[in-house]
């Protein structure tokens, strides 16, 4: 071959090889595309199906409350909340209430009260001085929110108690005939249990928060005479179900309207003796074995109303003092070592004014009367009413707080036909504080009749 022929031959062979390679690449590409579409056809459903979207449930590690932290060391009480319900009622749309209280879940506090089934600017408010009607319901709002028309009615009740066990709310709601009332136990929004009157004489309960420790809640209930011997029982409830009932034991003679607080691992209550004593009875509740003991606050500066003058009042820690025991008013106190913090009306005769103070040795020494850290909450020219305790868990300790019911209308203010209240709330503080007075503040002449 001459050189030109060699060049032509090499070029032809190269072109042939290149063509074959090109065709092979096309074949490979076609094969891949075919396989890809066949694979997709197998994975696509034959019909236009939809896959349901299931919610992802994230379970929080919710635990029962045990209140095992120590009690906060306080110097006194600082203002926390005031709802101004009566002043706001002058403009209408606020419930008529009484028997208010405060209780908290692990993250937020709520105010409760027993509504009268009417607003204040409504003719149905006439006669709401009466305690027990079938129209009364337990109201619940976030603390500081007055009971407006959108307020939740938790249950039917003319006597109640509520507490949160760390997982859900328990409400104890008493209603019905005086001689045959029913207490309903509502847990997590559902009716779980009930109990009927055992003495056929106005079954009633605390009108403030119950207490739950490690899932078991306890509440004090009374059935019987308001001015004589009554049948007092302490109920233990778990997730709304009554698991045990203990009778009152110890030296207390009469128990009503207890203000209870956790004293880990047990519960302690300071109550109202409506029969023999103006010194307040104490109930100690053992949450492990359901045993009960009772006595009286040792302080000679007694907490009930009416009462003797401080110079002549007394308490021996064990027995009612037989000093103006009837009728009485709901109140509170709590121990701090051998001392006692307490609140009471300023007037020894009527429900007016409100003060708090610490009595040195008032929990351990009979008739102790050394008072310190006194504060005026409501001056004596203004009406007060019931008061009670509630507990709040902080990062390091258990704080004690209290509320005061500020009653307006009848029986003291006869210009109007209704009876209702607002509240003011204070909590323990380790800081400093000033002075003041926090009455209801409504001008009765501005109010609907």
Curated annotation (Swiss-Prot):
Requisite cofactors: Ca(2+)
Membrane topology classification: Single-pass type II membrane protein
A Pfam match: Neur
Region (Disordered): 305-330
Main location: virion
Region (Involved in apical transport and lipid raft association): 11-33
Enzyme category, top tier: hydrolase
Keyword entries, A-Z: Calcium, Disulfide bond, Glycoprotein, Glycosidase, Host cell membrane, Host membrane, Hydrolase, Membrane, Metal-binding, Signal-anchor, Transmembrane, Transmembrane helix, Virion
Membrane topology (Virion surface): 30-449
Transmembrane segments: 7-29
Record region (Hypervariable stalk region): 36-68
Function: Catalyzes the removal of terminal sialic acid residues from viral and cellular glycoconjugates. Cleaves off the terminal sialic acids on the glycosylated HA during virus budding to facilitate virus release. Additionally helps virus spread through the circulation by further removing sialic acids from the cell surface. These cleavages prevent self-aggregation and ensure the efficient spread of the progeny virus from cell to cell. Otherwise, infection would be limited to one round of replication.
Subunit-level organization: Homotetramer.
Entry note about domains: Intact N-terminus is essential for virion morphogenesis. Possesses two apical sorting signals, one in the ectodomain, which is likely to be a glycan, and the other in the transmembrane domain. The transmembrane domain also plays a role in lipid raft association.
Name listed for the protein in its UniProt record: Neuraminidase
Species in which this protein is naturally found: Influenza A virus (strain A/Chicken/Pennsylvania/1370/1983 H5N2)
Gene, per the UniProt record: NA
